[in-house]
């Protein structure tokens, strides 16, 4: 499967009593589709997947696929620090009809590089759904090397990587290594760092899985489309229009600022699930100022 464009890592809205806000989630899905996004990710990091029960995880993916109704691509988060559990979650995503699965590297147990390859190979062997590997060492404690990602690209069914190591140099080396192996046409690099999406795409990336697009989808879509159309002047303008909001959205742990911003903007988000909690007052003011300057409130 080819991944190109703007994918939104959706938040999971909750009601005041802590349940999934199905009506709000469906509303957000339609709001984002109306803004022109390529695809939507449910039950990812931005969706507070770590604190969803298995039943809630499945419900989020079910609602997503049902409400989208084939209008855009659907991606289900299905990673775990247990290979067995990751296989079961990925099977569930496939059974529910998701177009792809986003599989984060195992976290906390810090598997070796060769173990990461075996992990993704096992998931691919057990399923037929396209897999996007997710490299985010700041959260997992393990950073997939360029060499490891190239090996993943050789696995049938692993079609892309969401690269969130924060290193543009690494993306350069990765694209060069993929090209050397003749894999660059069949394996996509997707930005996992909203503020680095422009340089990552300029170096061979084909899109973004964006948390900030929950808050400012229109500009992100326009920037990504501009890059894909080789209009880097317009892309640069949009990047600078967004960058202060992007920075403010990561001033505390994602999705704390994103849900705060959405609540301020009147979009369904609701409360956070413990252990995440409300933003510090001074950071809320920084966020509000960024939203005002970007004409989002």
From Swiss-Prot:
GO terms for molecular function: 2-dehydro-3-deoxy-phosphogluconate aldolase activity; 4-hydroxy-tetrahydrodipicolinate synthase activity. It comes from the Archaea. One of its GO terms (biological process) is diaminopimelate biosynthetic process. Its main location: cytoplasm. The active site is at residues 134, 162. GO terms for cellular component: cytoplasm. Pyruvate binds at residues 46, 209. Keywords: Amino-acid biosynthesis, Cytoplasm, Diaminopimelate biosynthesis, Lyase, Lysine biosynthesis, Schiff base. The keyword Cell division does not apply. Belongs to the DapA family. Homotetramer; dimer of dimers. Catalyzes the condensation of (S)-aspartate-beta-semialdehyde [(S)-ASA] and pyruvate to 4-hydroxy-tetrahydrodipicolinate (HTPA). This is 4-hydroxy-tetrahydrodipicolinate synthase. The gene is dapA.
């Amino acid at each position: 499967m080819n991944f190109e464009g703007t994918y939104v890592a959706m938040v999971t809205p909750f009601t005041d009593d802590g349940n999934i806000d199905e009506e709000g989630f469906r509303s957000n899905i339609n709001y984002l589709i109306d803004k022109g996004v390529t695809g939507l990710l449910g039950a990812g990091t931005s969706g507070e997947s770590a604190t969803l029960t298995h039943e809630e995880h499945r419900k989020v993916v079910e609602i997503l696929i049902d409400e989208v109704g084939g209008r855009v691509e659907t991606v289900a988060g299905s990673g775990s620090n247990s290979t067995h559990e990751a296989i079961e979650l990925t099977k569930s995503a496939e059974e529910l009809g998701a177009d792809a699965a986003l599989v984060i590297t195992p976290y906390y147990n810090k598997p070796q590089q060769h173990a990461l390859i075996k992990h993704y190979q096992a998931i691919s062997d057990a399923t037929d759904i396209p897999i996007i590997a997710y490299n985010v060492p700041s959260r997992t404690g393990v950073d997939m090397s360029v060499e490891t990602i190239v090996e993943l690209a050789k696995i049938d069914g692993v079609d892309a990587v969401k690269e969130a190591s924060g290193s543009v140099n690494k993306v350069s080396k990765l694209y060069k290594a993929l090209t050397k192996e003749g894999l660059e046409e069949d394996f996509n690099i997707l930005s996992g760092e909203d503020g680095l999406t422009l340089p990552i795409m300029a170096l061979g990336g084909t899109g973004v899985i964006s948390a900030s697009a929950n808050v400012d989808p229109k500009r992100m879509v326009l920037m990504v489309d501009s890059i894909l159309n080789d209009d880097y002047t317009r892309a640069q303008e949009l990047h600078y229009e967004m960058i202060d909001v992007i920075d403010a959205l990561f001033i505390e742990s994602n999705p704390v600022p994103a849900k705060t911003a959405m609540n301020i903007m009147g979009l369904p988000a609701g409360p956070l699930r413990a252990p995440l909690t409300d933003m510090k007052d001074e950071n809320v003011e920084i966020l509000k100022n960024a939203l005002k300057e970007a004409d989002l409130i």
